[in-house]
Amino acid sequence: LCGRPITQRSRCILGRETCIAQVVWSDDGWLRLKDGGVVPPKEYSVNLPEHKLEPIPVKDTFNIKELPPHLNTLRIPLDEIGSLTEREGYLRLYGNESITSWNKQSMVARRLQHHNAEATIKMEFYPETLQQMAGLTVFYDTYNFFYLYMSSDEMGHNVLRICVRDGLKFYNPLNGAISIGEHSEVYLRAKIDKLKLNFYY
């Protein structure tokens, strides 16, 4: 496994990745790069036939019976947290525990593959309490994420909020909420440009 930080001292926003390198066992029992050093070359020549993969679709629609391989749930099969068949053409997720839970989150995610990316979702949600929320997250793990979500305020009106978790610290960069009135259908977007993230609605 490897990581590709954007700068020498920054985080690896693409997470852990699989890499291939030619290695040898050293006299002291450790794997070392065959050509020495600590940074492997970007490309290797191998004597294998080319195997082209189908490109991952840019847009996901849910007129399907099961999740495609590029969409993942977090530790729980989809049929325990949602459905692709209850409402044709939609992915339905059932409310469960919070985004910080290690046990039962209702999350469907797509891995970030590039340092620059954009994701947009169309979401329909009917929160009844302050504790009910659904939205779009840029998620590294349960201790590090950005979360744009819809919830309800004290008066029962729908609002958008942002939650940021950085280790053990939580904060709301909006210092409050954005009222969206009675709207239950909303488009949410995350735009990632290396170390910069912007949310839109």
Give the residues covered by each predicted segment.
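Carbohydrate-active catalytic/glycan-binding domains of CAZyme proteins
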Residues: 1-201
